[in-house]
Amino acid sequence: VSSGEIVTIVGPNGSGKTTLFKAIIGSAPIASGKIIMSPSVKVGYVPQVLNVDRSLPLTAERFLSLVNNRNDQGLLRAQQILGSEDYLSTQISSLSGGQLQRVLLARALLNDPDVLLLDEATRGLDQPGSAAFYKKIEEVRESSGCAVLMISHDLHVVMSASNRVICLNGHICCQGEPQSVASSPEYRDLFGSNIDGTFALYQHNHKENKSRINHSNA
């Protein structure tokens, strides 16, 4: 994964997408293959689901303060995501879906990451909410130059917003530029051929930079 690159991982449920992300952040063992990561790389992670005990008194502000490795640049980026929103004093369990995703994104940015991992980060959001969230992601990518590695079931987003697509089904079925993957037999076997009419939720310009993470058979 190169700086500034947007790579999207697709595949059916149970294909290993979330497990791959957990392996990257070190919370799941690697069954085979290896992940090669630069020793200095910083990773931010937005999980698919945040499991919080609803009886636990935890405000959004307190939740953000629990991050230990934050830095000044990360704090600035997190503040830009949150803006002047007044829900920081709200209990995490009471936040709307869109508010929670902003808080999770802000938390992932506190260490000013080189690579941002998004595990179905717009799950549960409606189309306007998803579009607003992806716009924030693009703003972060443009301002920081970080790479974005995301899992998504929204094939419109995948085909319009990614520099590269990796299709998993227990192994790498196919990978490459979006249109190349969309026309591959392996992809069509999984998702069908109805990929016309995709739309861009945001625009992006990819700049080639030094690779930060290499993935090999994991």
Q: Which residues does each predicted region cover?
A:
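Conserved ABC ATPase "signature" region
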Residues: 72-87
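Conserved ABC ATPase signature
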Residues: 91-95, 99
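Hydrophobic anchor residue at the start of the ABC signature
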Residues: 105
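Catalytic Walker B motif of ABC-type/P-loop ATPase nucleotide-binding domains
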Residues: 116-119
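H-loop/switch region of ABC-family ATPase nucleotide-binding domains
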Residues: 152-153
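H-loop (His-switch) and adjacent beta-strand-loop-beta switch element
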Residues: 165-177
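ABC ATPase nucleotide-binding domains
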Residues: 183, 191-218
